[in-house]
């Protein structure tokens, strides 16, 4: 049996399947991707069906309206405190509740304001559907989970591929135009929250959620 290593050019060598793990509903397959070994099967998820939420999270969700979830994943940003304070100000101005998943680079106040809850992390597949809007950095995995929830996504890209996915979210009407991390402010956050409540984005987010769930 031949291994054709390292990728020896041979007419006998079978084509290596190439899987692109994102949803074709988010980024359609390019017209020039005609090779039979190129596949876009949809997102891959690693759900946690056995997750049991801590009591403080259960209590917070039961106390009021679905919150805005704010998570920047494993990103470490020098302005984490300023960004968090801007998000808190935006929530206060709009009367929204909020859950902050602080991750590796998060900051939390010593005394969180009423209507907010700060956690290190929580499974996206469990938490996101219980929220109102998802605010995140645009990482591929968080974008996938946010879109699958069927809720509006407000993307605050930091670096690397995040601006690309942020633009795709807006292009499919699953969220407003992205807010680059260095431009994040209470005013821009308030405007994005208002836009996320509009009929167009609500419908777009729900539609992409249905498509991804069916893939």
Residue ranges and their predicted role:
Residues 19-21, 40-41, 119, 156, ...:
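Hydrophobic residues at beta-strand termini and immediately following loops
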Residues 56-57, 122-123, 188:
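Short acidic active-site motifs
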Residues 102-123:
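Nucleotide-activated donor-binding/catalytic signature segment of Leloir-type glycosyltransferases, i.e.
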Residues 119-168:
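A donor-sugar binding/catalytic signature common to diverse glycosyltransferases
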């Amino acid at each position: 049996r031949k291994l054709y290593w390292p990728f020896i050019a041979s007419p006998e060598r079978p084509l290596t399947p190439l899987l692109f793990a994102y949803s074709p509903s988010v980024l359609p397959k390019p017209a020039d991707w005609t090779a039979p070994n190129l596949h876009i099967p949809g997102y891959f998820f690693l759900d946690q069906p056995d997750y049991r939420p801590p009591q403080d999270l259960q209590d917070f969700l039961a106390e009021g309206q679905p919150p805005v979830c704010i998570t920047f994943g494993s990103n470490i940003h020098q302005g984490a405190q300023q960004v968090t304070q801007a998000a808190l100000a935006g929530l206060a101005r709009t009367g929204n509740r909020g859950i902050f998943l602080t991750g590796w680079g998060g900051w939390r106040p010593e005394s969180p304001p009423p209507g907010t809850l700060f956690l290190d992390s929580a499974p996206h597949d469990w938490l996101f559907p219980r929220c109102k809007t998802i605010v995140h950095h645009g990482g591929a995995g968080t974008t996938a989970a946010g879109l699958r929830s069927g809720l509006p996504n407000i993307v605050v890209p930091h670096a690397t591929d995040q601006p690309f996915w942020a633009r795709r979210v807006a292009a499919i009407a699953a969220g407003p135009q992205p807010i680059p991390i260095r431009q994040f402010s209470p005013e821009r956050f308030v405007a994005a929250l208002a836009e996320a409540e509009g009929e167009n984005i609500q419908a777009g987010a729900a539609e992409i959620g249905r498509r991804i769930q069916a893939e």
